[in-house]
């Protein structure tokens, strides 16, 4: 217990184990997909003993889930610390959803009309859009055409307009969004160290006095997280004081990324917590690039672009 002894393998055993391993790995009734290459399986020497080393690379999202047998719901496992644990059906379905290169957020929701979109949100968004793009030809379009240009709406099977998933999330009302995403929930809290006080301020998507969509949530929360960022008095551009610093942009980008990369089919929602000078943002779903690509930067793969 708590130790092991290297017994080693003979050359004959190594050849047999390699043959058995590759035979099993390439049998689609036993393993769904072989993602290993020859260099992943090789004999090495430990001390004076020969052993067979097998390196298992992380599967690309296009290949996940890799599972044992023929049923992904019963044969998909995840390595966690010292053990292999059966993945939940929810996690397996999320892997299948992430295989697509065409973003799922452009899927047309045939069962809805554009009346499920919040007109105040659309109006507010168009005002900001026009301020940022004053000469843009889309500013002259009617709302329906504008939404189609944004890919927030598209023609359904009957030839009429319906929102896309992106359009519903971005412009819809929360009670319509939860018809498609039952666990959709956006939550922002301002907390303090006083345990007797649950929070100093809170807003969430189910309050009912605002839309609860991700655009309005972003607008509400960005003003709250920006407020406490100190701006040096000497922060000027072309002789005029500028009330923004790089930290503002970083915080807003973090919030936008949490909304853009979230798996809204997941079991939990998005939680943003501000406590003094600390800010934590959590969302459902894993990143779709490798850890090395994430730290290297330059390779974005958003779930909901």
Language model region names:
Residues 1-247, 255-305:
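Conserved N-terminal catalytic/coupling substructures associated with nucleotide/phosphate chemistry
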Residues 250:
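Conserved N-box helix within the HATPase_c
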